[in-house]
């Protein structure tokens, strides 16, 4: 039986994540179709490998799509969210640095469309998030430490993923402490350590290729199709 491809709009198509999304989606033309690629500035070419490109200022005129994948900048987030709500399309967003007002807008939009916002779209990290929460619940009174390591060009510390894992630990009743390391070209490593008297548990995730984040975002887009409106976590989509 023929399956209609999921129509995607890639917002932030000129960035590193946007380029990875375009490349990986092109490997699955039977299930994924890039309806539009949106860049911050006017594109040098209007059509590349059959994909229509638009400037962010032209976003309202983008063709029909089922799900938008947004890895852009906070200033481009509002019009993307508004367009998804207007068209009843799902939204997968990994845009960082959004304000509290923008987070409130996300929560309001979740009443009308299915969406997921995450600091990390690795499926392994999604599983780690659940394991951390469960461990914190089971190990009341144990010390909880989160150590994150990244390449030397990463400026923010602790990383957004470390803070997300810390929130999972807090939901389980732990009080996490953070440490950060910047060295070489480390893509990303997150260690969550629970220490009791005479014993220690270490939960760790190591990323060796940035494509895992784009693959996770494409997985999330597929999983949002046909879902009821709501705000989902990546780990929810694994159920």
Swiss-Prot record:
Cross-referenced InterPro entries: DapB_C, DapB_N, DapB_N_CS, DHDPR_bac, NAD(P)-bd_dom_sf
Keyword tags: Amino-acid biosynthesis, Cytoplasm, Diaminopimelate biosynthesis, Lysine biosynthesis, NAD, NADP, Oxidoreductase
Chain positions recorded as NAD(+) binding sites: 12-17, 94-96, 118-121
One matching Pfam family: DapB_C
Pathway involvement of the protein, from the record: Amino-acid biosynthesis; L-lysine biosynthesis via DAP pathway; (S)-tetrahydrodipicolinate from L-aspartate: step 4/4
Protein family membership: Belongs to the DapB family.
Role summary: Catalyzes the conversion of 4-hydroxy-tetrahydrodipicolinate (HTPA) to tetrahydrodipicolinate.
Protein name stated in the entry: 4-hydroxy-tetrahydrodipicolinate reductase
